Amino acid sequence: EFQIMEGHMGDFWCQSTSAIDIRSYPAEGVMNRVANAKQPFRTFRSGQEYFCLRSENYESPDNEWTRLDLICFDGKSLHIVNGHVVMVLKDSRYILPDGKAVPMKSGKIQLQSEAAEVFYRDVRIKALTELPEEYARLFD
C-alpha cells in the first residue's frame, strides 16, 4: 500500500500476505524502519516488518494539492511525492500458506481514505514500456 494520509504520504504498509523489498535503514529496536534510496533492499512482509516510513515529508502545505506518482514496472516500484522519490521498492509478492512466494505482476488499483478526508483530481494511468531512465539507477 502506498499510504495517502496527511503526515504520511508515501509510507508503505503490507496488506494480507504480501511481501516486498524496500531500500531502507535497518530496524532499531521498536522504531519503524525508514526508507532511504542509498540503503540496501530489506524485506517487509505481513506479520513481521510490515510498515516502512517514507524517507522525508514532501507534502504540500495545508489547503494545497500534493502530487503523488506511483511508478510500477517489471517488478520495480517508486513512491513519489511532489516530484521527490520517497521510497524505492521491488519484487512485490504474496505468500501462499505453504510459504511459496508468487510475484504480483498485475492487479487492481484502489484509492481509499481511512479516517481522514481526502480529495483526488486528475487521476491518470499510463502504460510504460520501460522504467523512466531518471529512476533506473535507483535499482542498481
Q: What function would you assign to each model-found segment?
A:
Residues 1-140:
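Carbohydrate-interacting regions of secretory-pathway proteins
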